[in-house]
Amino acid sequence: MTTVMGTEAETMTTTWTLSGFGDEIDPDPAVQAAVLQSLGAGCIEVRSAWGVNIVDLDEDQLDALAAVFEERGMAVSAIASPVGKVDVTLPADHEVERLGRAIRAAERLGTRYIRLFSFFRGEGVAVEDIRDDVMARMRALADAAELAGVVLLHENEKDIYGDTPERCLDIVETVGSPALRLAWDSANFVQVGVAHPFDDGYALLRPHLEYLQVKDARSATGEVTPAGEGDGQVLETLTALRDDGYTGFASLEPHLTDVNALGGFSGPAAFGVAARAFRRLTDRIGVELA
């Protein structure tokens, strides 16, 4: 009997772990988990629960949140903290203390990743003028993360210091900590005028990328769109990540209907639209989502 063996390409399928910002679906974490699982995700990124930011949940609330996820068999990919999403003139200790609360949540919910930002500046203040203060704060945060054994994921949020590829690189190279890595967000790059995020930023940042946040945007209006429907070169980015051997998280953050104090919101229906758009892209390039 002759056995036909599969090719190497057929046997070495790339798999990424699908996650998503649960509070974009509903304030109730039980609903968040149910919808994510219905879309094929086994993980959740936690930004808030019951309308309360993750760093403001008390011990009882964290225990209740952990119980919800444990009951449903849902793992936590990252804590989507608000650390660093404040004016740089606030005392450094302010954000170090909030990071401590995010670390507490990460430990309780069983993840090593914590999303953070690199500070806003006042109106009329040049970005170059806040660099030293930003770096001092990012070093302090990275030091705290190293001590706790967690990894900080810097998101390229619009209008913070690190909102362009060049300044994201500046942060990780200047701080130089293994506890500070990068999350890639194509839409945010588009919204600050990076015309071609993949062409302009991928090679620069790939050595430091550890996490993928999934959304897209149109350059003419800044409108957020499902992945592949904007100008963020999402397909090119996904293809390169596949070819580079990326095997980490892909976290849906659609922002399709609203932006509020806790972040973006989509609702179950729009979140599903975003999830299916992303899956069409990964199917196209032969990446499995688990």
For every predicted segment, state its role.
Residues V55-E59, V88-D93, V125-I130, G193-H196, ...:
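Short, solvent-exposed loop/turn segments at secondary-structure boundaries
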Residues L18-G22, L152-E155:
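Short catalytic-loop micro-motif centered on adjacent basic/acidic residues
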Residues T2-S19, I25-G42, A66, E70, ...:
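Histidine-acidic metal/acid-base catalytic patches
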Residues E45-V46, V76-S81, R112-S118, V150-E155, ...:
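Short beta-strand segments at enzyme active-site cores
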Residues G6-S19, V76-V86, S118-R121:
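N-terminal small/glycine-rich loop or linker at the start of catalytic domains
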